C-alpha cells in the first residue's frame, strides 16, 4: 500500500471507544484514509454525513467504525433482540461483504450483526435475527418482509447507513428506503450516513429529506477513474473482439482480473472461450444462485480463479483485493458504471490497468463516458495478424443444476506473439 493513500490523521487521534480502537489497531489500521479522516470526526460527534469518494478508499470502514462507536457510547436497548442499527445495500453481495468487514469489530465489541437479503438463506437469517442482533445489514426487499411480518421492529434504531446510495436510488428503491426510514425514529433522534462513489445532486437532495442537517464530505480525485489506474482503449471489429481479448490476456498476463460485459449471454460466450483456452475462470451473472455466487467470489478472492467474467452485479461494492486488470469487453450503457467497473482495480493505493473495447455495438457509449470522466481514454492499435486463433468454446448446459460456473486448469501459458500495440 502506498503511503500517500493515507491521511496524516491516526485513528488514535479520534475519540473512539476503546474497544473499537483496539480492534482497528490489532488489524493494523493506524492512519485513516482521506474519506475516513473527513467523515469520522463528524459522525463520531453524532452529525449526519454524506460521503463521496472513489471505490477502494475506505468508505465501508468509515461507516462501520462510526456505527460501532455510536452503539457502544449511546444509551439504548443494549442486549435487546431488536436491531439498533440498520445498514442498507443495493445488492446481496455487498450486504455479505459489509458483514464480513464488520467481523473484526463484532469480535472485539460483542455486538452482533445479522443479514437480511433475498435469494436464499431465509431460515438461517430468520434464526439469527430472532436470537437478537444489534446491527441489521441487508437489502431493502428482505428487510421490508421482516418488518411487515413483525419479526423486525425499527423503533429502536439509532444508526442508519445507506451504502452505494446512488445505486439504490437508480434501481428504484426510493419508495422502499423511505418506507423503512419512516419506521425508524425521526432523523433528529438517529445518526444517518450515506456513502457512495458517485452521489448526484438529485440523489443528495432526495436523501437529505430524511437526514438531519447533514455534512457533505468529498474526496476530490485527480480524475473520476483514479490516477493510479492506467486506461487503454481499443476499437476492435466484432469479428476481432474475442480474439483480441484472448491475445491481451496472454500478453498482459493479469494476476487477477475481472471482465465485464453488458448481458448474461455475452458473459457466457466469454466464459466459454476462456475456459476452452485453459484459463481458470468463473462466471458471475444475475441468475447464478446466491450460494454459488458466494462460492465463486471466495474462489476468486483466495486465488483459485484468476478471471471473473461478470455483469454489473459485481461492479458495486465488492471488496476484492489485488485485482490487477479490468476489461470492459462491452462499454457500459450507464457512464457511471464505467467508473464503478474500473474501480475494481487500483484499490487501496495500489496501481491497476483498465482495458476497454469500443466495438461497433457499444462505441456510441464512449462520448458520454469520456465527458463524465473529463478526459479521453488513450487509444491503442492492434495488429490483426498477431491475434490468437480462437478455440472451440465450451457451452453451458441449460437445465442442469450441476452445471459449472467455473473452470480450472493447470495449463502453463507461453506467450505466442506480441500484439505490437501503438499508442
Swiss-Prot record:
Chain positions of motif DEAD box: 163-166
Top EC group: hydrolase
Residues reported in the UniProt entry to bind ATP: 53-60
SMART domains according to UniProt: DEXDc, HELICc
InterPro entries the record matches: DEAD/DEAH_box_helicase_dom, DEAD_box_RNA_helicase, Helicase_ATP-bd, Helicase_C-like, P-loop_NTPase, RNA-helicase_DEAD-box_CS, RNA_helicase_ATP-dep_RhlB, RNA_helicase_DEAD_Q_motif
Gene3D superfamilies for the chain: P-loop containing nucleotide triphosphate hydrolases
Gene Ontology MF annotations: ATP binding; ATP hydrolysis activity; RNA binding; RNA helicase activity
CDD domains the UniProt entry points to: DEADc, SF2_C_DEAD
Ranges where the record places region Disordered: 397-423
Function field: DEAD-box RNA helicase involved in RNA degradation. Has RNA-dependent ATPase activity and unwinds double-stranded RNA.
Protein name per Swiss-Prot or TrEMBL: ATP-dependent RNA helicase RhlB
Species: Pasteurella multocida (strain Pm70)
Amino acid at each position: 500500500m502506498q503511503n500517500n493513500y493515507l491521511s496524516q490523521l491516526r485513528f488514535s487521534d479520534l475519540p473512539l471507544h476503546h474497544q473499537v480502537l483496539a480492534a482497528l489497531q490489532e488489524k493494523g489500521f493506524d492512519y485513516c484514509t482521506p474519506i475516513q479522516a473527513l467523515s469520522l470526526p463528524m459522525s463520531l460527534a453524532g452529525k449526519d454525513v454524506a460521503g463521496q469518494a472513489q471505490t477502494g478508499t475506505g468508505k465501508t470502514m468509515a461507516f462501520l467504525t462510526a456505527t460501532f462507536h455510536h452503539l457502544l457510547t449511546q444509551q439504548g436497548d443494549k442486549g435487546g433482540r431488536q436491531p439498533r442499527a440498520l445498514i442498507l445495500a443495493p445488492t446481496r453481495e455487498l450486504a455479505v461483504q459489509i458483514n464480513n468487514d464488520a467481523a473484526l469489530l463484532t469480535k472485539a465489541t460483542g455486538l452482533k450483526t445479522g443479514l437480511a437479503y433475498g435469494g436464499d438463506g431465509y431460515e438461517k437469517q430468520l434464526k439469527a435475527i430472532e436470537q437478537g442482533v444489534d446491527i441489521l445489514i441487508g437489502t431493502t426487499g428482505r428487510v421490508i418482509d421482516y418488518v411487515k411480518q413483525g419479526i423486525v421492529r425499527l423503533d429502536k434504531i439509532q444508526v442508519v447507513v445507506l451504502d452505494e446510495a446512488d445505486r439504490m436510488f437508480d434501481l428504484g428503491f426510493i419508495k422502499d428506503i423511505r418506507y423503512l426510514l419512516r419506521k425508524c425514529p425521526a432523523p433528529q433522534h438517529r445518526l444517518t450516513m450515506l456513502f457512495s462513489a458517485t452521489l448526484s445532486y438529485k440523489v443528495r437532495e432526495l436523501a437529505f429529506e430524511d437526514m438531519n442537517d447533514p455534512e457533505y464530505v468529498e474526496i476530490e480525485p485527480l480524475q473520476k477513474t483514479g490516477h493510479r489506474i492506467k486506461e487503454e482503449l481499443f476499437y476492435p471489429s466484432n469479428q476481432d473482439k474475442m480474439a483480441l481479448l484472448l491475445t491481451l490476456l496472454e500478453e498482459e498476463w493479469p494476476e487477477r482480473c475481472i471482465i465485464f460485459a453488458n448481458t448474461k449471454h455475452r458473459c457466457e460466450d466469454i466464459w466459454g472461450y476462456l475456459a476452452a483456452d485453459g484459463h481458470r475462470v468463473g462466471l458471475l451473472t444475475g441468475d447464478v444462485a446466491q450460494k454459488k455466487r458466494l462460492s465463486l467470489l471466495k474462489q476468486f478472492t483466495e486465488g483459485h480463479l484468476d478471471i471473473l467474467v461478470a455483469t454489473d452485479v459485481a461492479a458495486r461494492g465488492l471488496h476484492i483485493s489485488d485485482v490487477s486488470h479490468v476489461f470492459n469487453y462491452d462499454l457500459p450503457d450507464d457512464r457511471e458504471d464505467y467508473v464503478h467497473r474500473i474501480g475494481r482495480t487500483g484499490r487501496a493505493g495500489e496501481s491497476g490497468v483498465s482495458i476497454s473495447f469500443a466495438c461497433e455495438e457499444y462505441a456510441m457509449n464512449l462520448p458520454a463516458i469520456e465527458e463524465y470522466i473529463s478526459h479521453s481514454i488513450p487509444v491503442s492499435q492492434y495488429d490483426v495478424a498477431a491475434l490468437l486463433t480462437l478455440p472451440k468454446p465450451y457451452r453451458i448446459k441449460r437445465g442442469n443444476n450441476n452445471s459449472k460456473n467455473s473452470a480450472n486448469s493447470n495449463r502453463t501459458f507461453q506467450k505466442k506473439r506480441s500484439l505490437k500495440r501503438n499508442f
